[in-house]
């Protein structure tokens, strides 16, 4: 489904569109449901025929043949139920998988700005809890609705052929019940949306607490986390109680309706018998059909709850799918290729969310192969400037270009293919060391991965581990030391081998000896490539081609180490302060 379809189509049309690729299974499910309804309708008629004709006329042979046919019909009914249960759930799972695939693919298109504003736990709830409810609606919803309506309509038709006055009583009561269902469903839907929101909150609290469990234990704040979770859990429990209260009212009304229907049929039927207008056999047949009504009506009640819950999840899914990416490729975007590495910022301004100013009138020209070190006080805009180069965010004013092409004029994929980044906060996937390094180049051979590990000074550490490259790194790499995580991230970049490098405190977690070893590897890697290094340890960037000093979102100074020391400005002050601290 295309993105524009989510913008233009109704929620229900979006939902039904997922049935299309699996319509054969859906049709099979509906056909089996129809056969189940037919068998349920036949039994009262067979009973009536037996009492009217077969037994009074001593047609015992015919009676037992009919009973055998009924047994066979119920065998077929059981088979139909198996198909409904097995293949119906298979249909639901396939719909769920398609929806989840679309949602995950859409999340991949959203920019940093979206994830800055939304918590991971809430997104996890959309991908799991909400989709489960949508799946249940996809499978059971149409099936329950179809069986119920087919049984009710079929039963009414038969009842009108038996005694129209009794059938009229039932027909009058059914619309009243439908009105009650509609009114209560709206209330159920409102409460269900509140429950969904609370589930997302509690999922977020769990994700946050488990991710930060080491921090909580380090501060002995387990009680604080428990209190935060308990508060979220209480809010969830309250919303769930409201939902069950509404469901309880609905169920009570439904059971009352069913009882009134039975009483009304017996009362009117009894009156007709007293006046010689109805016999006992037809009243018994009617009672059997009233019993046949109970199951589909209960299914309708179940459908009302399922629809309310599933629709709430469906609305949340659609809302997320309608979220436009902050960054889009231009319709005529070019594929960036043959990158030399020239970077030009022309009167560049940037503000987060359009109002939090970070960079002001930045002018910068980086020639191909130049190594630029970016230093300055924390919060000055160093990392932000480097995040604009791979277009994680768009500039607010001015322009940023690579090899003369504005980064907004090329595809994001081709742009980022030519840039290698080692971020300050290293993220490793919960997988093996091998797969984490291979992430830099999914098609890499084992020999290439081993060479990248050697150049990143992590090979010996890996081989000393019991499982070598197949060692599991833990959640976010928690089973490795900080330096090991950093070097695995660096190995990814060696493997990717891009023409532009961005190193954001890439050696910050390394000890002095390892840092010294890897610095020469960085120097070798930087040859012939454009390299931007964000550094707080000024001693590591003395050999940079040029050093930029960024403070308060502006380039305040630039030059070589010697030139900036002679200037005796911000850089000289930072360098002198660090030198004194080391001694």
Explain the meaning of each model-derived region.
Residues 42-44, 48, 73-76, 142-185, ...:
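A hydrophobic transmembrane-helix motif
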Residues 20, 26-80, 160-165, 276-280:
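Transmembrane helix-loop-helix hairpins at lipid-water interfaces of multipass membrane proteins
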Residues 1-40, 55-66, 84-92, 99, ...:
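Membrane-integrated ABC transporters
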Residues 21-24, 112-113, 129-138, 142, ...:
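An intracellular "coupling" helix at the cytosolic face of ABC transporter transmembrane type-1 domains
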Residues 69-76, 206, 253-256, 260, ...:
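Hydrophobic transmembrane alpha-helices
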Residues 329, 336-583:
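ABC-type nucleotide-binding domain
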Residues 2-5, 93, 101-133, 204-228, ...:
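Short intracellular "coupling" helices and adjacent cytoplasmic loop segments at the cytosolic face
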Residues 221, 245, 293-320:
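Cytosolic ends of transmembrane helices, especially the final helix of ABC transmembrane type-1 domains
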């Amino acid at each position: 489904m295309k993105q524009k379809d989510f913008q233009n189509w109704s929620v229900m049309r979006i939902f039904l569109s997922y049935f299309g690729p699996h319509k054969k299974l859906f049709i099979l499910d509906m056909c089996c449901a129809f056969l189940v309804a037919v068998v349920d309708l036949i039994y009262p008629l067979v009973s009536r025929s037996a009492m009217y004709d077969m037994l009074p006329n001593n047609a015992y042979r015919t009676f037992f043949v009919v009973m055998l046919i009924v047994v066979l019909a119920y065998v077929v009914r059981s088979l139909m139920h198996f198909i409904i249960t097995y293949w119906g759930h298979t249909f639901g799972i396939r719909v769920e998988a398609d929806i989840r695939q679309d949602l995950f693919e859409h999340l991949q298109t959203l920019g940093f700005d979206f994830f800055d504003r939304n918590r991971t736990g809430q997104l996890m709830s959309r991908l799991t809890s909400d989709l489960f409810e949508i799946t249940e609606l996809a499978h059971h919803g149409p099936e329950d609705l179809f069986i119920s309506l087919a049984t009710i309509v079929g039963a009414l038709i038969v009842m009108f052929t038996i005694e129209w006055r009794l059938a009229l009583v039932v027909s009058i009561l059914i619309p009243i019940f439908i009105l009650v269902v509609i009114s209560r469903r709206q209330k159920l839907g409102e409460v269900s949306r509140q429950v969904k929101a609370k589930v997302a909150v509690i999922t977020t609290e769990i994700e946050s607490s488990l991710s930060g469990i080491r921090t909580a234990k380090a501060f002995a704040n387990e009680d604080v986390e428990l209190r935060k979770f308990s508060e979220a859990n209480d809010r969830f429990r309250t919303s769930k109680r409201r939902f069950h209260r509404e469901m309880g009212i609905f169920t009570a009304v439904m059971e009352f309706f069913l009882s009134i229907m039975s009483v009304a049929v017996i009362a009117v039927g009894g009156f007709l018998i007293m006046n010689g207008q109805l016999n006992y056999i037809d009243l018994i047949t009617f009672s059997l059909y009233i019993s046949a009504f109970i199951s589909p009506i209960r299914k309708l009640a179940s459908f009302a709850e399922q629809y309310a819950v599933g629709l709430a999840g469906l609305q949340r899914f659609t809302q997320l799918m309608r979220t436009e990416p902050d960054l889009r490729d231009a319709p005529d975007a070019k594929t960036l290729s043959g990158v030399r590495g020239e970077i030009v910022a022309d009167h560049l301004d940037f503000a987060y969310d359009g109002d939090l100013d970070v960079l002001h009138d930045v002018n910068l020209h980086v020639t191909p192969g130049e190594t630029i070190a970016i230093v300055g006080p924390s919060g000055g805009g160093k990392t932000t400037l480097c995040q604009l180069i791979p277009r994680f965010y768009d500039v607010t004013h001015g322009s940023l270009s690579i090899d003369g092409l504005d980064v907004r004029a090329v595809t994001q994929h081709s742009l980022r293919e030519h840039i290698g980044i080692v971020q300050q906060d290293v993220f490793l996937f919960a997988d093996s060391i091998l797969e984490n390094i291979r992430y830099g180049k999914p098609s890499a051979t084992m020999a290439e991965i081993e060479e990248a590990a050697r150049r990143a000074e992590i090979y010996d550490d890996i081989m000393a581990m019991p499982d070598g490259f197949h060692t599991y790194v833990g959640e976010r790499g928690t089973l490795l030391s900080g330096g090991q995580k950093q070097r695995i991230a660096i190995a990814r970049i060696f493997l990717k081998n891009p023409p532009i490098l961005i190193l954001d405190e890439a050696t910050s977690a390394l000890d002095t000896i390892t840092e010294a070893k890897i610095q020469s590897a960085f120097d070798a890697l930087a040859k012939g490539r454009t390299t931007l290094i964000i550094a707080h340890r000024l001693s590591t960037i003395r050999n940079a081609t040029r050093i930029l000093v960024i403070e308060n979102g502006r380039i305040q100074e630039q030059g070589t180490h010697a030139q900036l020391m002679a200037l005796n400005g911000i850089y000289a002050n930072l360098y002198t302060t660090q030198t004194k601290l080391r001694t």
